[in-house]
């Protein structure tokens, strides 16, 4: 027994990049299917990330943030809900081109599933 459904975009792999691709695709109006073999979305951020996984934020030579988008959106939502710590830059690396932001990976996974529902993926 089978059924047929048509999609505009099929994303294979629900790691961090696949999650971002599926959300972006749906937000741009494409009927999107995300396929993940493990049943848990997030890849390194969920299945093999250490407790208190850190977002590394990269900055350019002028000190402006280079990385943002959907992953940054997840960080901001987790921070607002109390499941992430504010970004931190090591005092001994004051001019470092990155900061760290620690999040709870279990809550990140829950948020990603919530975002999939919000976007109809």
What are these regions, as identified by a protein language model?
Residues 12, 36-37:
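A secondary-structure boundary/capping signal
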Residues 8-9, 31-33:
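Structural motif
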Residues 17, 21-26:
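Small-residue (primarily alanine) positions within well-ordered alpha-helices
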Residues 3-17:
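Beta1/beta-strand and adjacent pyrophosphate-binding region of the FAD-binding site
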């Amino acid at each position: 027994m089978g059924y047929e459904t048509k999609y505009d975009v099929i994303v294979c792999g629900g790691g961090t990049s696949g999650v971002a691709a599926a959300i972006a695709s749906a937000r741009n109006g494409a009927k999107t299917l995300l396929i993940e073999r493990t049943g848990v979305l997030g890849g390194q951020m969920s299945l093999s990330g250490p407790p208190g996984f850190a977002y590394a934020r990269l900055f350019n030579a002028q000190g402006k943030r280079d990385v943002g988008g959907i992953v940054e959106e997840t960080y901001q939502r987790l921070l607002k809900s109390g499941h992430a710590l504010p970004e931190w830059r090591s005092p001994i690396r004051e001019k470092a081109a990155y900061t760290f932001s620690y999040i709870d990976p279990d809550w990140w996974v829950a948020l990603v599933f919530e975002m999939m529902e919000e976007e109809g993926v």
